[in-house]
């Protein structure tokens, strides 16, 4: 009972403190302006369920082009200015052999990871062609599970050389010009027991080192990644052995763990998770610095991220087997509410705050499962997360500017977070500023005081803004009803204070 009283007193004190404070933002004059890499708005696609087959690739569908690519998906991806797409996995890649997916003599294979058949009709050539139509960079993740360093470097040869066995095979397959694929990753989540071909800490560093050496011998200016985590016990030995061969370390994050039971967290519970991605980023930056690769010598690629993990019961339990029908629960429209939209905005804000080191991020995945786009045979739906990505790729300016913030708390049980999350961007001349502000409160409008003088501006009578809010915190989009989308509004200002709508992402424009 005494413990409960202490906890209640602590919570009450935090609530009173929160009520006493004001929410304010101002430019940090000491901070350094950074031109962030738009690759942080990247995407990911895996041979899982209906992401590729029946998703982005559906030959014979009236909505597909002559190559079998869904044109509505391509157009939607152009709307969010997709800069890069990671493929083919994901866990799938750890039993994928790229040679099975090229040429005219392809055969379907049994995918041991997801325990189903893959027809191999969407392989390297189709992927690169699809990326060209989307207008994005291809980013290939190689098989470091059941594959070998030589197989990885052969794949680089197939994509990038005009000479040798594999470059000539690409030409024979109808593609005489090299693809010049720049981004390559050694492995996927090889630290995990769920991964087929998982490695020990002692095995992983040498595996990465030798793979990277072979791959770079083919393409000198390749950008090379390796599967890592924010755990120093894994990543420090990796960097000690192989850091000198790498440009990036790859980390992943899903914060609503729905592997076995599809019981999505509530809006407020999701908001309590919004600080977690930045903690992982900071831990990973600390690992890089400890290993002697700080200051951008090696950068971070958050190349799989989403609020909610994919629902695939019993994956990794080889005795129990895979529940195929359960995968359909990933596509329930009502799952993807304003919680997903706001969490995604907070994630992107964290990437921007550390954009000197976080250089690439890939939302996981682009289509179906937990994707920003839901695709069926008759059309598609842009989920709430799609419009988060749309706002960040269309309305932000190109330079991140550090800001000083003072935010009150949003408290739920024994957990708390700041009620607001914000970043500031500007154009090259520092004439046009855009604040990206997230209000995590499910019900309350939150007043925010803006220091206009720190931007060299006078307080205007009103501000232009783009707002993504929906009708409630649990609002979502479905086929034929995409009402959760950005709205242009005018925000009134009184004594430098502007009202931020509840459960919203608000982009405030200051000119």
Q: For the regions a protein language model found, what residue spans apply to each?
A:
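Bacterial N-terminal signal peptides that target proteins for export
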Residues: 1-8
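Hydrophobic h-region of N-terminal signal peptides that target proteins for export
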Residues: 12-20
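Non-catalytic accessory regions flanking glycosidase/transglycosidase catalytic cores in CAZymes
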Residues: 20-234, 239-248, 277-278, 282-313, ...
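Glycine-rich, phosphate-binding/catalytic loops in enzymes
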Residues: 202, 318-319
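Short glycine/proline- and acidic residue-enriched helix-loop micro-motifs
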Residues: 216, 263-270, 330-331
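Active-site cores of enzymes that catalyze phosphoryl transfer or operate on phosphate-rich substrates
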Residues: 245-248, 267-272
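Active-site His/acidic residue clusters
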Residues: 253-269, 315
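Active-site gating loops and adjacent loop-to-helix segments of metal-dependent hydrolytic enzymes
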Residues: 319-326
């Amino acid at each position: 009972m005494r413990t409960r009283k202490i906890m209640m007193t602590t919570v009450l004190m935090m609530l009173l403190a929160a009520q006493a404070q004001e929410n304010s933002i101002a430019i940090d004059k000491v901070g350094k302006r950074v031109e962030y890499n738009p690759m942080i708005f990247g995407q990911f696609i895996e041979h899982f369920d209906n992401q590729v087959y029946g998703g982005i690739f559906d030959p014979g569908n009236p909505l597909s082009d002559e190559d079998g690519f869904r044109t509505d998906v391509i157009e939607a991806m152009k709307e969010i200015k997709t800069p890069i797409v990671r493929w083919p996995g994901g866990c799938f890649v750890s039993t994928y052999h790229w040679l099975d997916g090229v040429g005219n003599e392809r055969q379907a294979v049994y995918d041991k990871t997801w325990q189903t058949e893959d027809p191999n009709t969407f392989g390297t050539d189709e992927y690169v062609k699809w990326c060209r139509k989307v207008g994005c960079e291809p980013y290939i993740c190689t098989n470091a599970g059941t594959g070998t360093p030589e197989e990885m470097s052969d794949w680089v040869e197939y994509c990038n050389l005009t000479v040798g066995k594999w470059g000539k095979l690409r030409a024979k397959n109808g593609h005489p010009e090299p693809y010049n694929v720049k981004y390559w990753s050694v492995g996927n989540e090889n630290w995990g027991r769920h991964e087929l071909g998982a490695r020990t800490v002692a095995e992983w560093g040498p595996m990465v080192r030798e793979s990277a050496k072979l791959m770079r011998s083919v393409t000198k200016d390749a950008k090379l990644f390796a599967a890592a985590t924010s755990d120093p016990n894994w990543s420090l030995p990796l960097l000690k052995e192989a850091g000198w061969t790498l440009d990036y370390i790859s980390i992943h994050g899903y914060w609503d763990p729905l592997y076995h039971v599809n019981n999505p967290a509530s809006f407020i519970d999701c908001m309590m998770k919004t600080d977690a991605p930045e903690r992982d980023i900071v831990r990973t930056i600390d690992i890089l610095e400890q290993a002697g690769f700080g200051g951008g010598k090696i950068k971070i690629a958050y190349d799989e991220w989403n609020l909610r993990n994919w629902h695939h019961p019993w994956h990794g339990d080889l005795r129990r087997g895979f529940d195929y029908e359960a995968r359909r629960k990933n596509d329930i429209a009502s799952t993807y509410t304003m919680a997903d939209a706001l969490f995604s905005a907070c994630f992107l804000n964290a990437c921007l705050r550390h954009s000197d080191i976080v250089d690439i991020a890939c939302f996981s995945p682009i289509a179906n499962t937990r994707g920003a786009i839901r695709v069926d045979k008759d059309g598609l739906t842009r989920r709430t997360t799609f419009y988060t990505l749309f706002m960040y790729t269309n309305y932000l300016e190109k330079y991140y500017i550090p800001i000083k913030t003072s935010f009150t708390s949003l408290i739920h049980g024994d957990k708390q977070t700041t009620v607001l999350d914000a970043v500031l961007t500007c154009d090259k001349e520092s004439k046009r500023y855009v604040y990206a502000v997230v209000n995590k409160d499910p019900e309350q409008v939150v007043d925010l005081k803006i220091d206009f003088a720190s931007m060299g501006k006078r307080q205007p009578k009103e501000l232009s803004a783009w707002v993504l809010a929906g009708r409630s915190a649990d609002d979502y989009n479905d086929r034929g009803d995409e009402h959760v989308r950005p709205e242009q509004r005018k925000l009134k200002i009184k004594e430098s204070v502007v009202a931020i709508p509840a459960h919203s992402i608000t982009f405030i424009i200051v000119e």
